[in-house]
């Protein structure tokens, strides 16, 4: 596959990831409200779980590496998850004096995302 074609597939994966992030975030607002950045937390945890599954699957040889790592890992998951929005969410919370919510958001994003990635990786390990 040419680099140009691969870039096109990565961009397509990114488009699906960005649209997924938007839809998941909007669903979180509808279900949980705007009092906490649930959407960012949700996409980061889901993306981390999927990254663990992807990387374990690749490392175990369950799927052939080929273009899947950059298409899914860089494109889809790169656009689905978001560190910049996570950062801005915390700045906004702190600007509004919501320091406990900001701390909780930081703790939950880091702890749950790493845990989800670990779980995803372990799920795909060969027994």
UniProtKB/Swiss-Prot annotation:
GO cellular component, one term: plasma membrane
Cited Pfam families: CRCB
Gene Ontology biological process terms, A to Z: cellular detoxification of fluoride
Residue numbers binding Na(+): 78, 81
GO molecular function, one term: fluoride channel activity
Bilayer topology term: Multi-pass membrane protein
UniProt entry tagged with the keyword Protein transport: no
Keyword Protein biosynthesis tagged: no
Record comment: activity regulation: Na(+) is not transported, but it plays an essential structural role and its presence is essential for fluoride channel function.
Keywords: Cell inner membrane, Cell membrane, Ion channel, Ion transport, Membrane, Metal-binding, Sodium, Transmembrane, Transmembrane helix, Transport
InterPro entries named among the record's database cross-references: FluC
Protein location: Cell inner membrane
Catalytically driven reaction(s): fluoride(in) = fluoride(out)
Domain of life (superkingdom): Bacteria
TM region positions: 4-24, 35-55, 71-91, 99-119
Role according to the record: Fluoride-specific ion channel. Important for reducing fluoride concentration in the cell, thus reducing its toxicity.
Family: Belongs to the fluoride channel Fluc/FEX (TC 1.A.43) family.
Protein name: Fluoride-specific ion channel FluC
Organism: Photobacterium profundum (strain SS9)
Record gene name: fluC
């Amino acid at each position: 596959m040419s680099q140009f074609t691969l870039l096109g597939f990565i961009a397509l994966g990114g488009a699906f990831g960005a649209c997924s992030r938007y839809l998941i975030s909007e669903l979180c607002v509808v279900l949980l409200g705007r009092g906490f950045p649930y959407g960012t937390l949700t996409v980061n945890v889901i993306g981390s779980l999927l990254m663990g599954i992807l990387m374990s699957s690749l490392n175990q040889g369950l799927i052939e590496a080929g273009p899947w790592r950059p298409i899914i890992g860089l494109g889809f998951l790169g656009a689905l998850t978001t560190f910049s929005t996570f950062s801005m969410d915390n700045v906004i919370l702190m600007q509004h004096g919501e320091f406990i919510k900001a701390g909780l958001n930081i703790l939950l994003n880091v702890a749950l995302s790493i845990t989800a990635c670990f779980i995803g990786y372990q799920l795909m390990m060969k027994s």
